[in-house]
UniProtKB/Swiss-Prot annotation:
Function: Converts heme B (protoheme IX) to heme O by substitution of the vinyl group on carbon 2 of heme B porphyrin ring with a hydroxyethyl farnesyl side group.
Gene: cyoE1
Miscellaneous notes: Carbon 2 of the heme B porphyrin ring is defined according to the Fischer nomenclature.
Cellular compartments annotated: Cell inner membrane
Main location: membrane
Keyword S-adenosyl-L-methionine carried by entry: no
Protein species of origin: Shewanella frigidimarina (strain NCIMB 400)
Transmembrane region(s): 18-38, 42-62, 91-111, 114-134, 139-159, 169-189, 213-233, 235-255, 274-294
Protein name (Swiss-Prot/TrEMBL): Protoheme IX farnesyltransferase 1
Pathway: Porphyrin-containing compound metabolism; heme O biosynthesis; heme O from protoheme: step 1/1
């Protein structure tokens, strides 16, 4: 295989943002296994994970096309293939659309209408609402984007149940809330990039003081909402213990941002890093510490 072909293939992989796909795989598996309550259909599980991964990859590829102008202004993203021209925008867009078609087809064939609906809503919000408009024009872009980031575990959950019940609602709220301090931490340690691209994330638009306050508040509310899973009977004492330990540590870490001698860049990286540990730990624990509970539907669609 020639070096040129290898580089091109690497470029196609990079536009799908493998790190984001991996994180979503963990969360969709967590939601799926929580809902399965020990009765795991492996074919359905892997079809859901692969299908949703392709949908996420599609959204990321299309996002690369949309963001190429602002990516050119940011140190972290200026070498993306859609910026350098190593791969044409048309090729990346076609690649992304193709991934999306295959991903949605897999979800439609193997899962159910509700799982497909949530995947579609998440896709439209991320690509159509967040990437095309909110990210560039509003300080609330992060809030809107948090919904699409919370969709994967809900898709995994609904792929099993075929209904929207309280467990799915808690997952949606929990993962949406987690996205906020996670994203604000990135915006702080990448402050110069966002400012250069004129992206109105909270630290840039309204200052570090407000950003630090929001990080603390969102972590606190995230902890409370996460505790609803065991309190509602969906998980057991192990999940409650992990929720308490990780959330308390994350909150204590966030509060250190108010120290006068703190290096904000280093602090934000720590908050970001521990956010990954927190959500991974909770996703794994919910998959293992599920409880058998009656799943009362709030919304059901015909499969």
């Amino acid at each position: 295989m020639s070096a040129q072909l290898t580089s091109r293939l690497r470029g196609y992989v990079q536009v799908t943002k493998p790190g984001i796909i991996m994180g979503n795989l963990i969360s969709v598996a967590g939601g799926f296994l929580l809902a399965a309550q020990g009765n795991v259909d492996l074919t359905l599980m892997f079809a859901t994970m692969i299908g949703l991964s392709l949908v996420v990859a599609s959204g990321c590829a299309v996002n690369n096309c949309i963001d190429r102008d602002i990516d050119a202004k940011m140190q972290r993203t200026r070498n993306r293939v859609t910026v350098t021209g190593e791969i044409s925008v048309q090729a990346v867009l076609s690649f992304g659309i193709g991934l999306g078609i295959i991903g949605f087809a897999m979800l439609a064939i193997f899962t159910n209408s509700l799982a497909v609906l949530f995947a579609a809503i998440g896709y439209v919000v991320y690509v159509g609402v967040y990437s095309l408009y909110m990210k560039r024009n509003s300080v609330y872009g992060t809030l809107v984007g948090s919904f699409s980031g919370a969709v994967p575990p809900v898709v995994g959950y609904c792929a099993v149940t075929g209904q929207m019940d309280m467990g799915a609602v808690i997952l949606l709220l929990m993962f949406s809330l987690w996205q906020m301090p996670h994203s604000y931490a990135i915006a702080i340690f990448r402050f110069d990039d966002y400012a250069a691209a004129n992206i109105p994330v909270l630290p840039v638009a309204q200052g570090m003081t407000k950003a630090k306050l929001h990080i603390v508040l969102y972590i606190a509310v995230f902890a409370v909402v996460s505790a609803l899973l065991p309190l509602a009977g969906y998980t057991g004492i192990a999940f409650m213990a992990v929720t308490f330990a990780t959330s308390l540590w994350w909150l204590a870490m966030a509060l250190k941002g108010y120290r006068r001698d703190i290096n904000l860049q280093s602090w934000a990286r720590q908050v970001f890093g521990f956010s990954i540990i927190t959500i991974t730990a909770l996703s794994v624990t919910m998959a293992l510490d599920f409880q058998v509970v009656a799943q009362t539907p709030l919304l059901t669609l015909v499969p």
